[in-house]
């Protein structure tokens, strides 16, 4: 497998990533603490309307200097990390990890960790000391980021929090 930056005309290949997964628990923030709660559901691919909504936003992100890092198995995109270019945080030392997705058949093989590490290296080269992450509140996702060193952000970005209040807002050192 190879890891490399995506070209603008490859952005829509992101939608070929298989997001399917069975979930048994989600996290919620209560009084500044993570609380694990039972919540069984099956995610089958991309949510309705997500592709139509996010595609233009991804092009805007790319055009303003966002970094799109892909993991490829031969010519097949099996994972992606998208790093935005807009500084966040009171000190302006955070960059948002907009996306981190790995196809179902490639999980638990270090793909996500490699993509996160590459996004962190790019963020560091741009002067950031933290990745800002709005993590899907599923148990597997939150645990992945915690294993990579991320912690709950107790002062989330107001705009990003308003967009995704159910997500677990985290920061991860780069």
Predicted regions and their residues:
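Acetyl-CoA-dependent GNAT
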Residues: 8, 16-93, 98, 103-104, ...
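Conserved acetyl-CoA-binding loop-helix of GNAT-fold acetyltransferases
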Residues: 99-102, 108-121, 146-147
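Conserved GNAT acetyl-CoA-binding A-motif
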Residues: 123-136
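Structural motif
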Residues: 126, 147-148
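C-terminal "cap" of GNAT-fold acetyltransferases
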Residues: 134-138, 148, 155-174
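Helix-turn-helix
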Residues: 141
């Amino acid at each position: 497998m190879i890891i490399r930056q995506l070209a603008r005309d490859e952005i829509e290949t992101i939608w070929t990533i298989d997001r399917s997964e069975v979930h048994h628990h989600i996290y919620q923030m209560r009084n500044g603490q993570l609380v694990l709660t039972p919540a069984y559901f099956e995610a089958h691919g991309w949510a309705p309307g997500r592709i139509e909504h996010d595609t233009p936003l991804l092009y805007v992100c790319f055009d303003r200097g966002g970094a799109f890092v892909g993991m490829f198995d031969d010519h097949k995109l099996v994972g992606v990390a998208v790093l935005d270019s807009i500084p966040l945080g009171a000190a302006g030392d955070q960059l948002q990890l907009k996306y981190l997705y790995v196809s179902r058949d490639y999980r638990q093989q270090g793909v996500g960790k490699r993509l996160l590490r590459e996004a962190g290296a790019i963020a560091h080269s741009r002067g950031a000391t933290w990745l800002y992450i709005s993590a899907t509140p599923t148990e597997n996702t939150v645990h992945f980021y915690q294993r990579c060193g991320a912690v709950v952000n107790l002062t989330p970005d107001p705009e990003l929090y308003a967009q995704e209040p159910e997500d677990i807002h985290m920061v991860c050192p780069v």
